[in-house]
């Protein structure tokens, strides 16, 4: 009996110790779950102090659990908020980049026009004095139309510039022939000879080509920046589906219900869930990358032959050169006009002398070359501005296909990619064995974590794809120097959230997008929950002791 009693006593003590340890660990783990639950602003009465039966759980694994039904429901809502927060940080950064660059470019362009107009006005006042003041509305109208084209569009630049030179010819023709009286009909006839006579030399043709190409490229580029920011803003409003929400809950908080509060989701597990929840956003990537490439093409034009700064900065000198050319060739031009339109009627003698005295044309029309050019617009140059935007555009490529990986790279969402064994796989603390699915809606049919209806693409995403496609076409036209018409992007891409998340909040200072796809490891079966629980340890020890006692009795 003594031999039998001692082992029995030792086994009994071991079982009791293991049971006490298991109870203590369970209590401790549930206490930590409760503390974290309350720290999120939830009612502590929802959280049990000790493990309870988990038959009430709908999404998280059942069995012994630290979560009540109320906790699971609130964790479900919290997981959606956590998802929105992390995705919005990624999206807001991109949105802020485009918004800030559009603002800089817009300010630069408008200030460039203001500087050019001021420079022309100052130069012409010094050069032509009263004659310019009498005709200044002609030049004001020119800049009004240029500004209107940039802000509103709906201006035919070629027709507008042709009209400017025709009106300038009428004014100049009167001045160089101030001894004659010209009716409106006669001046209209004079305008018809503008192309044939070329009274301003080759300046109108060259300037029209330069202005049209530069303005089209500049406005299209600015509109592209605005469209890009608008697309990001609309696409990035998160509205996860019910299936996505279930997967998010299981990934982020179901580990808490098992008491594993410090164990983060496996990286590939997170990747599958993000690719399922952001499936529609992945379909943007192809058209987005085409759009970025088209923007970069136009940027090259802005740095080269379509540089609007090099066109607008000397526009006063170019127009003045045209005026001087008209003055130098006024006799030949007048003779040809008189031949085509007929001889004009002379003014009375008194009015002739007074008109010549008032114009003082020959004495006042002298070229003027200001020593100081206009100050740099918006405190920068177009070259520096375009260089900066090009860098940001290159960094923005593959943004949508990289978004799931970048969300999982956030330490709040998943364990590191190298920590494959000590992570939460949706059932327990163990390696995640499923392969990572591809990006985009079509690849989600075999997603092991999120059930996605691949037959129903998001309507808002389709609208953004079309908006990008249209804008890309306009970029290519601008690259070739062709004028373009603009649609209202706010109407074309309107709609509520699509299921991808971004609300305008604080953004990181620089891009940090990872375009590398992380492939998971394939397997034929799911990973079961791992890590032996304290309760299981006590149970195994008890069984072992009972078997030992039975065998010892048989030996006796």
From Swiss-Prot:
Residues 1-18 form the signal peptide. Glycans are attached at residues 494, 498, 500, 514. It is found in: Cell membrane. The modification Phosphoserine is found at residue 357. GO terms for cellular component: cell surface; external side of plasma membrane; extracellular exosome; glutamatergic synapse; Golgi lumen; lysosomal lumen; nucleus; plasma membrane. Keywords: Cell membrane, Deafness, Disease variant, Glycoprotein, GPI-anchor, Heparan sulfate, Intellectual disability, Lipoprotein, Membrane, Phosphoprotein, Proteoglycan, Secreted, Signal. It comes from the Eukaryota. GO terms for molecular function: coreceptor activity. It is a lipid-anchor; GPI-anchor. Pfam families: Glypican. A lipid is attached at residue 529 (GPI-anchor amidated serine). Residues 530-556 form a propeptide. One of its GO terms (biological process) is regulation of presynapse assembly. Its main location: membrane. InterPro entries: Glypican, Glypican_CS. It is linked to Keipert syndrome: An X-linked recessive syndrome characterized by craniofacial and digital abnormalities. Clinical features include a prominent forehead, a flat midface, hypertelorism, a broad nose, downturned corners of mouth, and widening of all distal phalanges. Additional variable features are cognitive impairment and sensorineural deafness. Cell surface proteoglycan that bears heparan sulfate. May be involved in the development of kidney tubules and of the central nervous system. Belongs to the glypican family. This is Glypican-4.
């Amino acid at each position: 009996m003594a031999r039998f009693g001692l082992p029995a006593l030792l086994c009994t003590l071991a079982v009791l110790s293991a049971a006490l340890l298991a109870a203590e660990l369970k209590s401790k783990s549930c206490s930590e779950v409760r503390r974290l639950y309350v720290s999120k602003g939830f009612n502590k009465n929802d959280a049990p102090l000790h493990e309870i039966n988990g038959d009430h759980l709908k999404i998280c694994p059942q069995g012994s659990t630290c979560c009540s039904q109320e906790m699971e429901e609130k964790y479900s809502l919290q997981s959606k908020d956590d998802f929105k927060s992390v995705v919005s940080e990624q999206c807001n950064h991109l949105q802020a980049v485009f918004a800030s660059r559009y603002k800089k470019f817009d300010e630069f362009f408008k200030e460039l026009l203001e500087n050019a107009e001021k420079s022309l006005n100052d130069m012409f006042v010094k050069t032509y004095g009263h004659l310019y003041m009498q005709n200044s509305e002609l030049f004001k109208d020119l800049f009004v139309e240029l500004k209107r084209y940039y802000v509103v569009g709906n201006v035919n630049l070629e027709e507008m510039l042709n009209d400017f030179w025709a009106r300038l010819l009428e004014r100049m023709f009167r001045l160089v022939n101030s001894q004659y009286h010209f009716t409106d009909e006669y001046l209209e006839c004079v305008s018809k000879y503008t192309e044939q006579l070329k009274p301003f030399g080759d300046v109108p043709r060259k300037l029209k080509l330069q202005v049209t190409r530069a303005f089209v490229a500049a406005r299209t580029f600015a509109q592209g920046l605005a469209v890009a920011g608008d697309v990001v803003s609309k696409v990035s409003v998160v509205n996860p589906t019910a299936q996505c929400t279930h997967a998010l809950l299981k990934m982020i908080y179901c580990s808490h219900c098992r008491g594993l509060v410090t164990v983060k989701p496996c990286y590939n597990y997170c990747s599958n869930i993000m690719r399922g929840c952001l499936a529609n956003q992945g379909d943007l990537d192809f058209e987005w990358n085409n759009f970025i490439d088209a923007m970069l093409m136009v940027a090259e034009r802005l740095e080269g032959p379509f540089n609007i700064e090099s066109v607008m900065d000397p526009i006063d000198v170019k127009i003045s050169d045209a005026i001087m050319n008209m003055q130098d060739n006024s006799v030949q031009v007048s003779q040809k006009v008189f031949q085509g339109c007929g001889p004009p009627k002379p003014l009375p003698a008194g009015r002739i002398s007074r008109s010549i005295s008032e114009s003082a044309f020959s004495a006042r029309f002298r070229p003027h070359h200001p020593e100081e050019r206009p100050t740099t617009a918006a405190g920068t140059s177009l070259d520096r501005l375009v260089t900066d935007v090009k860098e940001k555009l290159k960094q923005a490529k593959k943004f949508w296909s990289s978004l799931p990986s970048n969300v999982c790279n956030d330490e709040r969402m998943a364990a590191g990619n190298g920590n494959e064994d000590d992570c939460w796989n949706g059932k327990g603390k163990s390696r995640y064995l499923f392969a990572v699915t591809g990006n985009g809606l079509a690849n989600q049919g075999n997603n092991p974590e999120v059930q996605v209806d691949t037959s129903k693409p998001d309507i808002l995403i389709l609208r953004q794809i079309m908006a990008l496609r249209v804008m890309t076409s306009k970029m290519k036209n601008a690259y070739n120097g062709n004028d373009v018409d603009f649609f209202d992007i706010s109407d074309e891409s309107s709609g509520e959230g699509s299921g991808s998340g971004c609300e305008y909040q604080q953004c990181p200072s620089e891009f940090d997008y990872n375009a590398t796809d992380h492939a998971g490891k394939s397997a034929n079966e799911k990973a079961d929950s791992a890590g032996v629980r304290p309760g299981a340890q006590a149970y195994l020890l008890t069984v072992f002791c009972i078997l030992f006692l039975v065998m010892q009795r048989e030996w006796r």
